[in-house]
Amino acid sequence: MGTSQAFLVLSCLLTGPSLIVCQLLLPSILPNENEKIVPLSSSFSLRCFGESEVSWQHPMSEEEDPNVEIRTEENNSSLFVTVLEVVNASAAHTGWYTCYYNHTQTEESEIEGRHIYIYVPDPDMAFVPLGMTDSLVIVEEDDSAIIPCLTTDPDTEVTLHNNGRLVPASYDSRQGFNGTFSVGPYICEATVRGRTFKTSEFNVYALKATSELNLEMDTRQTVYKAGETIVVTCAVFNNEVVDLQWTYPGEVRNKGITMLEEIKLPSIKLVYTLTVPKATVKDSGDYECAARQATKEVKEMKTVTISVHEKGFVQIRPTFGHLETVNLHQVREFVVEVQAYPTPRISWLKDNLTLIENLTEITTDVQRSQETRYQSKLKLIRAKEEDSGHYTIIVQNDDDMKSYTFELSTLVPASILELVDDHHGSGGGQTVRCTAEGTPLPNIEWMICKDIKKCNNDTSWTVLASNVSNIITEFHQRGRSTVEGRVSFAKVEETIAVRCLAKNDLGIGNRELKLVAPSLRSELTVAAAVLVLLVIVIVSLIVLVVIWKQKPRYEIRWRVIESISPDGHEYIYVDPMQLPYDSRWEFPRDGLVLGRILGSGAFGKVVEGTAYGLSRSQPVMKVAVKMLKPTARSSEKQALMSELKIMTHLGPHLNIVNLLGACTKSGPIYIITEYCFYGDLVNYLHKNRDSFMSRHPEKPKKDLDIFGLNPADESTRSYVILSFENNGDYVDMKQADTTQYVPMLERKEVSKYSDIQRSLYDRPASYKKKSMLDSEAKNLLSDDDSEGLTLLDLLSFTYQVARGMEFLASKNCVHRDLAARNVLLAQGKIVKICDFGLARDIMHDSNYVSKGSTFLPVKWMAPESIFDNLYTTLSDVWSYGVLLWEIFSLGGTPYPGMMVDSTFYNKIKSGYRMAKPDHATSEVYEIMVQCWNSEPEKRPSFYHLSEIVENLLPGQYKKSYEKIHLDFLKSDHPAVARMRVDSDNAYIGVTYKNEEDKLKEWEGGLDEQRLSADSGYIIPLPDIDPVPEEEDLGKRNRHSSQTSEESAIETGSSSSTFIKREDETIEDIDMMDDIGIDSSDLVEDSFL
């Protein structure tokens, strides 16, 4: 640049660019005009002069148009000249032509130079042809824009339209329409010589842009290993017109891969990602992203430094030394600073053993402070002596490993571990041994007090010197922190006190010991031995008392309850001992012969017996006799007497084991009940299972797991239990084995048991679709085993149990242990409900679970009985449902495979119920489900259960059953005959034409009795007024009649009202009573 040129530049800087002189800095164009019109198809040239090399910018490049030529001319002056020549000019050559200095132009700056605008009018082309990108007009929101529809003739009038609507806007033929336009398509129109010309659509698109770029740079990490992939992202928010450039070490190698992702929700976000795969150490350095807004000249950049290592590394820096101490019970923390990549694994060891993380006294913790920096802490909480040792921290990853070990000592105050009189010499000498511990190791000193009475005063103690005659002191170290000292006295003539003192920097420990002269020691030894013996005796007595109290006691399951609230929801147990016992039930012991044992338990047994004189029609009758073992306690005798009184209170019924008599005087208590020929229902079902399966082949034979049997070995099955000392089951009365008899009086007459005649009936309603032969119904309520066990037999058992429980409910009696093992089967397949707990070893029976001092049949109990100890008739209904499951699984154990534990209790609470057994119909299973309702009020009563099951049986079954029941009540069965005297008095003053009228009256009372138990809760009991012993028989009969009447009126029950036979006289009744002994004494005092 010459001197004149430099002067011009300086003048422009001082005076401003508006001066004419500054224009000299730009090149010159000839012709020197702002615009020029060139005829179509003509040629024109433009000449550019400048101080340095110059170039041209024009509407069409030389590559696109061969009609354009640019050349450089040489001249004698110092100026540079470039000529642009166009031949055969067309409308496409219309536009700006600019000459500029080459050295003033950069890629990012706009062209600065001299301009001239050339028009080439074309009558066939009013508008300059558009380029590929000219039809898209991008503008920032709410900013002005230019729609570049340019004309080839400056005098052409142009209009702008948007969807057919004229848009007012200012127009410049060299620029186009300028204004603020809404988004959408626009078309320019022009009319030349009567012809209308239209441009193609210009689409205006508004972009969102702000004055700030809001640039954010992020990288997942700043430290990498060789071979890993570097990923860096830059995000721009709320801007759509952004130009972003990356600068990074690998840029020159074009190693990076860039991507752009646009996210529009919830706000506009442009995410630029740079990925450098397989990084090397050369890729370490600064990574920069620079964003520039295309429309507002706003620029922002972010930088992050990334380091790439050949491999991973680990560095540790502990904040403590190799030897550390901690005071006893002190809280101490040891911190190690770690720098590592990749992420390290940190572990602590104590004496080469890994510390468990969940220790409460020693804890370890790792916290990440920065990308590659970590802090690991070892914390001792209330340090203990055993915390001393060598601690090691190990930090490692796949490429490197570092460790650091330090020794920790717990400083412990001195204390005395042991002070004993260790040795007695033959001449009266004694040695005292003192063991002390502490860290640092303590020193031991000895002190002596010769006046025992003044040893409480420290001034009476003197330090024992090591050089005293007849006294020897010595010390030995035992371990790191334990020391032992000994002092020996040649002779001790009187009692003295010796004190051992242990001292270290943290504290002092001391203990004292008395040395007794040998003459006094023997006296103390004798006193100590007597005291120890006394303590042993007292402890033994306490243990025996506890064991005796925890021993299970016999408890009768049947309970009579009485309501204490109007709705029956609250009740109390009636004390059975308050119930009266009528001496008419007394039976002479010499009229009873005892035989084989039928069942035996922890508290008593049931034996087979023969009774003489119980019934006029059967002078000799086979009976079952309940009795206690000889070792029974008074509480168990009282429980058996309570059972007797409850049975007398209940009265007779076909489907309970009826009381026949009792022996309560001059010996052990015997309760005489009916003899049940077939034993308990469980064993009966087991025994007849094969016959049932043969009649019902459609029922699959399963693996019998619920019976505990082995199906593969049929020869090992035993459905009849012959031994009762172990499980207490009732024996099969048909079993002909040799048993041990307990004779009291030998009689040779043959026992005869009255047989209840069976009845025929129709088939059940629920089986109407099946054809039932008469032979299939013959074995119901009969002993005919030719047909085997049938499904109708199971329904018959179900019905009879419901009727028996209905009777107990009418008497306010709660069974509490209703199960198939407590249901017996008599001749005629008559079901008898009983309480067989006396003759069952419940302590070894898996069906009973220990609860305190009693055993409970949990699997048969209702939830309110298990969890709330609440027993009502409705809880018996639940047990009845479990009994049905036993019957229709042919004697299976409820909840097969489930143990009675917390899981079992939780399942019952959550509503778990057993599935339908194999041999139950859907109607029968529906009964079970109703019985197992978790809400007691929604369970059916036994009255309704009887009706439901009755509908499943043949139509004539109920009539046959009622006839058998009525025949039973009309018979001279001992249970009926002994109650008839009271019931006959209820008919005093009432005249009947015949026995049938009386039966009809009784049947009406029976229906009332069944309805009285239908409430599902508790019927109020009449007041019990025991009969005075001195009243005669007639007075007692009148009282019993009144009581029965009151009970019938108040409870709606006529269970105690029976039929007086027409041929029966008072003399007959008296003769029956004469069989017993004197009734003046009701029971021995020892049982009350």
Curated annotation (Swiss-Prot):
ATP binds at L598, G599, S600, G601, A602, F603, G604, K605, V606, K626. Residues 1-23 form the signal peptide. Present in an inactive conformation in the absence of bound ligand. Binding of PDGFA and/or PDGFB leads to dimerization and activation by autophosphorylation on tyrosine residues. Inhibited by imatinib, nilotinib and sorafenib. It comes from the Eukaryota. CDD domains: Ig4_PDGFR, PTKc_PDGFR_alpha. It is found in: Cell membrane; Cell projection, Cilium; Golgi apparatus. This is Platelet-derived growth factor receptor alpha. It comes from Rattus norvegicus (Rat).
